[in-house]
Amino acid sequence: MAREQDSINSHPLDKYIDENSANESEIIKSSSQFSHEDQQKIDKLSKQIKPMDNDGLLNYGTEAQSNMSQFSHRILNEVKTTDVGPVGDSLNGLMSKLKSVNPEELNPENQSKLKRIFKRTKASVNEIFSKMQSVGSQIDRISIELDKHKNNLKKDIDMLDELYDMNKDYFDELSIYIEAAKHKQYVLQQDEIPKLREQAKSTGNQMDVQAASDMEQFVDRLDKRIYDLQLSRQIAIQTAPQIRMIQNVNQALAEKIQSSILTSIPLWKNQMSIALTLMRQRNAVSAQKAVTDTTNDLLLKNSELLKQNALATATENERGVVDIETLKTTQKDIIETIEQTLQIQEHGRTKRKQAESELNELETELQNQLLDMKENK
């Protein structure tokens, strides 16, 4: 619907969604502020409503209602076909891989226990290195899948924008039909019916009495037709926030996926790289200490001095750059981010089911109204 220049960017449905406090009467009131172009359409449609033309009245606005019905079908199909299940599978896979590497395995104290029990510390360290490399490769593949899911969600968001604009167009079209019918109803009630009643009263002619009665019946049917169109418009009013609800859930999910790809995964890789570097440093220090101890055994005369130097060197080298507890906290934050994303997905799935149920009810109501129209005919 065209609007005046000072309100061209303000649509009743947008106001309804943004303010949340607007009720239906406020929306209908704002929609009555038609532009000059819309008023011309209203006048034209109003003149096309011919008194006593029951067939014409029956078909009045049916094209707009049919478009609204087809639009409701499309919305329902989009809700049914939009499947974010693979997104959840990918996120679950990512969480599983992140949890598969335990920072405690990089703790030197645990490595000492392994040495005492299995006598194979070197093999255990190599296994950890290999495991982390394998997990890193798998996370890269999951990252590619998540990026694809994010792009699909963005396409769905754009598609929902188009549907939202279409819904506004249907709302505007129905508002024009309703306004034109109300205008015609007012003219008949205030002008035509009083004239026919006066004529019947003055002439006493039964045909004139019947003509007045027929006109009153026509106005009553016109009022019912207006109500049917208002029901269709109500669908558009209720569909707008439902579209935005689905769209906002998809947007939040896409943002969480992007956060995982651009922040969580690189951070995990960096922290694991640091941990591996520290592990190698600790191994180098251990080797250095062993050489120093052997030298101390061979150089008895300088044993005390060498012992002091070796202990001082070992103490300095044993100091870690990054605490294991810090690494555990970082990984915990990453996992919490993924879990929040899964919660958003579950919330989105619930909202879509709710939207699907409501849309089915609205579609059934509209079909019942159309059937009633046909039966009344």
Swiss-Prot record:
Region of interest (Disordered), ranges: 1-39
InterPro entries: Toxic_anion-R_TelA
Comp. bias intervals (Polar residues): 20-34
Membrane spanning residue stretches: none
Pfam families to which the protein is assigned, alphabetical: TelA (PF05816)
Record's compositionally biased regions (Basic and acidic residues): 1-18
Parts forming coiled coils: none
Assigned protein family: Belongs to the TelA family.
Protein name: TelA-like protein SSP1345
